Amino acid sequence: MKGLTYYIDRLYANPKGTIIPNDVKRILVCRPNGRLGNQLLITPLIQELSETFPNCTIDLFVKGNLASFLFENYNNVDRIIRLPGKPFKELGKYIGVWWSLRKYKYDIAINIVPNSSSGRLSACLTRSRFKFLGDLEDERSVSHTELQHMAKFPVYSIRKILSQFSIPNKERPIQEMDIKLSQAELANGKKVLESIVTNPEKETICIYTFATGGKCYSKTWWEEVYKKLNSAYAEKYNILEVLPKENISQINFKAPSWYSLDIREMGAVIANTKIFISADCGVMHLASAVHTPTVGLFSSNNINRYAPYNNGSIAINTNTTGAAELIEVIEHLLHKH
């Protein structure tokens, strides 16, 4: 795969021609990854493309079924081209989806992640006039925090590429992550939340204690945090734990808990809470994408790439921040918002 993409990279290294923004009608965005967080992280790019190319429709090449729900309120997102979640169990379908990339013509095909071989290959397979593979040329190794973040890098990348086609960079702020919840969804989320919490008259602090692999904090760690959280805020706030589909609670279900199979309903409930606290995971990014101030907990060195991204959120390095200091951060955010 790497050898093939190396050849393709050389073939499409310097696209030539003219791009007139109002004439761009169809764009393909390639992010063949099925994780919730990774698909949410492309929402700022989709918004950027919609502003830059006002007459375009956007197709997405992804993995799994999540994108259909995440982007259902994006009016200019059209086709969701989905790789099956388990390709070896659906090999024929998997191959067929790859070949379907040749079915439609695009003005622009964009790969999101530079080191994704499947993303680069999918962009190059298309019948597209311009194929952008995600590189920032001399800025690929830049250490600037803004460029490291996976919600921001694709936007900076496309801005730099388009500047080479004399499309001006307006230097506007990069949009927040957003699943565009409707007013009806938000109202239903409020109704669901009020049916769960102990006192609907109080605002709610929401926690999510699960994460995959090494990102998941121990029960001992979470129980210490919950004890301090409960001591500091139980009188003034409800505390709600949103559960994963595995029905696992790192605080042994000591707080009222709730789960939904509907990812948009889950987002709508979180949107009606005061603050959201979670380790690095897809649901953390979901909280950011519904504009709830989010405290993201990190113990690895990828904090600059995957910190919760919205106005009011913060990433905490738990290697240097203990439970007491975490409560101080939460206190600051509660008063700020």
Cite the ranges covered by each PLM segment.
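Conserved nucleotide-diphosphate donor binding/catalytic pocket of glycan-assembly enzymes
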Residues: 81-180, 199-209, 301-304
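Positively charged, low-complexity intrinsically disordered leader regions
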Residues: 1-24
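Donor-binding and catalytic core of enzymes assembling or modifying cell-surface/extracellular glycoconjugates
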Residues: 95, 217-301
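Active-site donor-nucleotide binding/catalytic segment of nucleotide-sugar enzymes
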Residues: 26, 30-33, 176, 180-248
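Extended, non-globular alpha-helical segments
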Residues: 16-19, 240-262, 309-337
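Short amphipathic alpha-helix
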Residues: 39-50, 65-66, 224-225
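Conserved nucleotide-sugar phosphate-binding/catalytic loop shared by glycosyltransferases and other
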Residues: 60-91, 316
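Nucleotide-sugar donor-binding patch of glycosyltransferase catalytic domains
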Residues: 133, 147-148, 285-337
